[in-house]
């Protein structure tokens, strides 16, 4: 279904990945505290001397450019997220800080101190999400969900969230906004679904936590919203798809949040399946129908057709490291991240019905990163040695980090501009 365009090596383990909403740009947050932003080769069509049209990204002649790179956090960068218009990039780290930087340059414009936990210790972040130009959501290890009004000029001394909720007993593992209602005047979401521990919850911007599901007796780790499904009976044609730690996808009917209504076995294994770490909706023109890409803890990416509720294809991101980041850029290319690599994939030319057999990635590997700890293009003063990680929080959130990274060998190496 997908072929690899390129494999991009990183200087440390990937902890977070974010795709720009309007441009072919990907940002990564690393265990070392670095944040790096890349511009991917455009999928624009070029004509050669024979009049044949080819895409530079498909032929491998395009360049991946490093827009900027900096040591953003003293500790690991746990999570990243672009603003709704793509102008700002928000990062949060185990140093207890949220930083808002210009996406184009990496220059920090604002900092927010994360509230301490009840013991007075740093409450490490798990998720950051810009719900609208006005509202930033931040989840932490202590199960807190903080809401910040971005119109207020915060300082790291006086910053306080406008609201704080605890929708789950355990840390929040995923957050998926629900689309605005038909009567919305702003056009931005005001409700969102979260997973944490063994429950799913729905929270409203004004009314707080609305509902929490029954105990699912399985850890829920990822979620995504999908609409455009057939409507029949009580079905509204929209569902939230949730990935579990035991290899099972559960489908939740929108508005019926007490319990799941369908199950899809993605990875069956004796003693329990692989954790479904991250989910992404496949664009309709690529998926040949409603489809969800599932990043697994064993490094595979599987494609599940919703409706038929079965796995139809699979590719391999990495043989030893789990998939941490997964999404589709504005040009429809899949971007997967995990371990110390990011891979960019395009639709296979011979994909036909959208289903290929087991494909392995890494057809082209671009040149390695020189990984100098420079802050070029950034006026932030983040420097010095890394503080010790919050070992408990990182080990809990990144269950696959104990594995030894395995770098692929024997791959062709292609040079490109401005990697560092």
From Swiss-Prot:
Spans annotated as Disordered: 39-63, 350-420
Per-repeat ranges for WD: 9-48, 72-111, 117-158, 221-262, 271-314, 318-355
Localisation: Nucleus, Nucleolus
Entry keywords, A to Z: Nucleus, Repeat, WD repeat
Compositional bias (Basic residues): 394-406
Family according to the record: Belongs to the WD repeat WDR55 family.
SUPFAM superfamilies assigned: WD40 repeat-like
GO cellular component: nucleolus
Residue ranges, compositional bias (Acidic residues): 368-387
Protein name, per record: WD repeat-containing protein jip5
Organism, scientific name: Aspergillus terreus (strain NIH 2624 / FGSC A1156)
